[in-house]
Structure formats: structure tokens, C-alpha cells
């Protein structure tokens, strides 16, 4: 694939965003960005000479959205070479195997770049993408490494070496995974529940955690993406995380078998996950779609135990996982849609639960990726998204418009407000779907 030079972001003058509401509830706040960082936050800040000033008009200014689990090598490939008729995880894997021989670096890169455009417009400025290494050519690896380089000025792309067909099960997978890491892939991935036996799955976890420890890398494994309550590789992942001193650097993604596990066993498992400092990622849109496909009724929701993990002290993030690919025909890079689905599936409709779901696509995911300088305090990177909402809860409810997206102090995307014009006698001329009355506080709400 021809190598294109990345286009650097132009040097930006100071940027002052006035009259913003922050996720912690503070209103009338100004944020000054200089040299790609926030240098001051507070009310009525003075504007240095030459500053671009933007009036937030009281709308919610948030750190950008972060996606902790995605498959960019497959994104926007829906219908190639056919569609997933059953809608199951296994047919999706089989369909991906049919598609892989037909892929080119150029096609993978072009689809990925288009998706990154969507992401920026959605205020999604950091993505962790798994990339399949079970291909001797490593086409997807090479394509996404090039995409990572090209989008670096405006989006942080973190890549996981993912042995889709099993690192022990697929011939050459371990060698290819190491090659991918040598080329510059950031994170060690795995899929223990897809190995031939439970023992092979456990062995793969040990092997891959040791590899990550040797190389000083993070770990993110597809773990127990199954309806089988006996799929318990997360406990092995937590064990080796502690043994190797990888606390805070390891993520268990999906963990859907926990939905079906015995409650007593889970009561022992959750403290182990917390003590090991293992992050958990649920993928609400995909878990509710793929899990429980073979159930009659009642059908399992399939998503892992999000509120219980949070209550146990585990850092939980949400991922989009798929957009228009062999596993999922829908999606558009909207992390607020992900948060809203997670809220519904986990029945987290309290004000606290709604806020936790917003955090699961922002600050929690930033911790999972280990993002430096994430936030809205002085010294943080001047990355932010202005949402047409007055609170995080309202942003989730409305899947709020991204009025403004800022990267390193430069505006990289603008979107018109969502406003409907009404022609009703005696009623307002416009509605934007925000509630005008003050909402109840968390303390007084039921």
C-alpha cells in the first residue's frame, strides 16, 4: 500500500470556550487552551490577545468519548461477501474467515479511515481496536498501522494483536502475533474460550500474559464471550495478572459467561478481579445481539454484570465492538448509543446509574487505554466535545448532538444543533428535546 504522509494539525491560536457546563455539574465555566493543553479553567477567564472565543451557551463540555473495544479491520464490510443470516457469533467468525482472503490493505485502510472520520464527528477521539493476526500476510495489521500513523494528529488509535482463531489452535498464530508486536502493535490480545480445550485456553492466557510482561505491554483479551457458565478464563487472567505484576494493565473484554454463572461463584470471582486490578469491558450493543441466540424463552441478555462489577470496585468500560461488519449490520460510532444500550440492558436507570454509563464511555475507558492527559483540568490535553445537553444524563437520553469537537485546542468538527420547528397554535416555535425544568438531585431522586 502506498505510504501517505500524515497531515499535521495546523498550529492553533489560543482557544477560550466560555459559559460551559462541566460533567461535575459546575456551570458558567470557561476553559482556556494554549499550546494544545488546557491552561486555565474557571469562571470569567481573561482572553489573551489573538484568542478564538467560543460561547458554549451553557451546553455540556465533556472530555472526548473513548472506545475501549472495537474491530476496525472489519468495520464497514457488511455484506462482503455475504451477510450473517443467523446473526450468531460463530457465523460471524466463519464469515470473517471467508472475507479475509479477499481483503486488500487499501480496502481495509479506506474503510478504517472513513470510520475514523465518523468517529471524530461523533466526538470519539480515542479507540482501542483489535486487529486479526491469524493471517500470514498480516494485511490488516499493516493497514491499521498505517491508519494509526495517518490519523494520529486527530485521533488516538491503539491496536491489539488479536489471534481471532486461537493463538494455540491456529497454525502460526503465535508467530504472527509476535510479528505484529514487532511491527508496532501496542497490546497483546487473546481469545482463550475459542481454543480447543479449557486447558488450552488457560495455557494461552498464561503464555500471552508472560509475553506481555516480557515486552512491557498491556493485555486485552476477549474473555469468556460465551453463554457457557463454565467458561471461566477471567479467573486465570486475574491470577496471572497478579503473578506477573500487571495490575492496572490488563483488560478482560466481554465476560458474557458471567451473566450465566452461579451467583456464589461470582461472589468469589469479583473480589479476585478487583484485587488483580483487571479492567472489564462490556459491549452492550453486541452482547445483547449475539448472546442468548440459541435460547428459547426466557432469553438471556448476555451482557456481563456491570452494576455488580462497579459496586465491587472494578473499573468497567463500554465498547462499540462492531459497526457494519460480519457480526453487526448497524452502528455509526456513537458512544452515547452504546451508553444508552448499556443503561437499558443493565437496568441502570437511576441518576447514578445513568452517570456511570456516561463514565463508561469516557473516563473509565480512558483509564483502560492508559491515556495521558485526559480530562478538563489545567495541564490536560485540550481535547473536548461540546454536547447539546445540560448534563451527562441528558446527553445519554438524547444521544446529544456533538456541537463542537476540539483536538489539541483546534476545532476539528462542528454540527448544527438538533432543533425542530413547530407550527402549533399557542405553542413554542422550536423544541430541542431538553427539559426546561430543573431535574431532581441524586440525593432526592428515587
What would you call each of these model-derived segments?
Residues 139-153, 170-279, 295-318, 374:
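Histidine/acidic residue-rich metal-binding segments in metalloenzymes
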Residues 218, 239-250, 286-290, 300-387:
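His/Asp/Glu-enriched, well-ordered alpha-helical/loop segment
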Residues 76-108, 184-187, 208, 233-251, ...:
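Active-site gating loops and adjacent loop-to-helix segments of metal-dependent hydrolytic enzymes
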Residues 20, 36, 58, 69, ...:
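Divalent metal-coordination and catalytic microenvironments
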Residues 78-130, 138-150, 175-182:
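Alpha-helical scaffold segments that flank or form the walls of functional sites
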Residues 1-39, 44, 355-446:
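Active-site microenvironment of metallo-dependent hydrolases
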Residues 95-110, 160-171, 192-199:
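Active-site mouth loops of central-metabolism enzymes
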Amino acid at each position: 500500500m502506498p505510504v501517505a504522509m500524515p497531515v499535521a494539525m495546523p498550529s492553533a491560536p489560543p482557544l477560550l470556550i466560555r459559559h460551559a457546563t462541566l460533567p461535575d455539574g459546575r456551570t458558567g465555566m470557561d476553559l482556556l487552551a494554549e499550546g494544545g493543553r488546557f491552561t486555565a479553567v474557571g469562571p470569567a477567564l481573561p482572553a489573551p490577545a489573538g484568542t478564538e472565543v467560543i460561547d458554549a451557551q451553557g451546553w455540556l463540555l465533556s472530555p472526548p468519548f473513548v472506545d475501549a473495544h472495537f474491530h476496525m479491520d472489519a468495520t464497514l464490510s457488511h455484506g462482503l461477501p455475504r451477510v450473517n443470516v443467523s446473526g450468531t457469533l460463530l457465523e460471524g467468525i466463519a464469515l470473517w474467515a471467508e472475507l479475509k482472503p479477499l481483503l486488500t490493505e487499501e480496502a481495509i485502510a479506506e474503510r478504517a479511515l472513513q470510520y475514523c472520520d465518523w468517529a471524530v464527528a461523533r466526538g470519539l477521539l480515542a479507540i482501542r481496536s483489535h486487529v486479526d493476526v491469524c493471517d500470514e500476510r498480516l494485511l490488516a495489521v499493516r493497514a491499521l498501522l498505517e491508519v494509526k500513523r495517518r490519523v494520529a494528529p486527530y485521533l488516538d488509535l491503539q491496536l491489539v494483536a488479536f489471534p481471532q482463531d486461537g493463538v494455540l489452535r491456529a497454525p502460526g498464530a503465535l508467530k504472527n502475533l509476535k510479528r505484529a508486536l514487532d511491527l508496532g502493535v501496542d497490546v497483546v490480545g487473546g481469545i482463550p474460550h475459542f481454543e480447543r480445550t479449557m486447558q488450552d485456553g488457560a495455557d494461552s492466557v498464561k503464555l500471552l500474559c508472560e509475553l506481555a510482561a516480557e515486552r512491557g505491554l498491556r493485555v486485552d483479551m476477549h474473555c469468556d464471550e460465551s453463554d457457557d457458565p463454565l467458561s471461566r478464563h477471567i479467573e486465570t487472567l486475574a491470577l496471572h495478572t497478579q503473578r506477573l505484576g500487571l495490575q492496572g494493565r490488563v483488560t478482560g473484554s466481554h465476560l458474557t459467561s458471567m451473566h450465566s454463572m452461579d451467583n456464589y461463584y461470582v461472589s468469589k470471582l469479583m473480589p479476585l478481579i478487583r484485587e488483580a486490578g483487571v479492567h472489564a469491558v462490556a459491549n452492550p450493543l453486541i452482547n445483547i445481539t449475539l448472546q442468548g441466540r440459541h435460547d428459547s424463552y426466557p432469553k438471556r441478555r448476555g451482557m456481563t454484570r456491570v452494576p455488580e462489577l462497579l459496586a465491587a470496585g472494578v473499573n468497567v468500560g463500554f465498547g462499540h465492538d462492531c459497526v457494519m461488519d460480519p457480526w453487526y449490520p448497524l452502528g455509526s460510532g456513537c458512544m452515547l448509543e452504546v451508553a444508552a444500550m448499556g443503561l437499558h440492558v443493565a437496568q441502570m436507570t437511576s441518576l447514578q446509574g445513568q452517570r456511570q454509563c456516561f463514565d463508561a464511555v469516557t473516563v473509565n475507558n480512558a483509564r483502560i487505554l492508559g491515556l495521558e492527559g485526559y480530562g478538563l483540568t489545567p495541564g490536560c490535553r485540550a481535547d473536548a466535545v461540546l454536547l447539546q445537553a445540560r448534563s451527562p444524563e441528558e446527553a445519554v437520553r438524547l444521544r446529544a448532538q456533538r456541537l463542537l469537537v476540539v483536538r489539541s485546542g483546534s476545532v476539528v468538527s462542528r454540527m448544527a444543533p438538533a432543533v425542530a420547528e413547530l407550527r402549533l397554535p399557542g405553542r413554542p416555535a422550536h423544541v430541542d428535546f431538553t427539559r426546561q425544568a430543573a431535574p431532581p438531585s441524586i440525593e432526592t431522586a428515587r
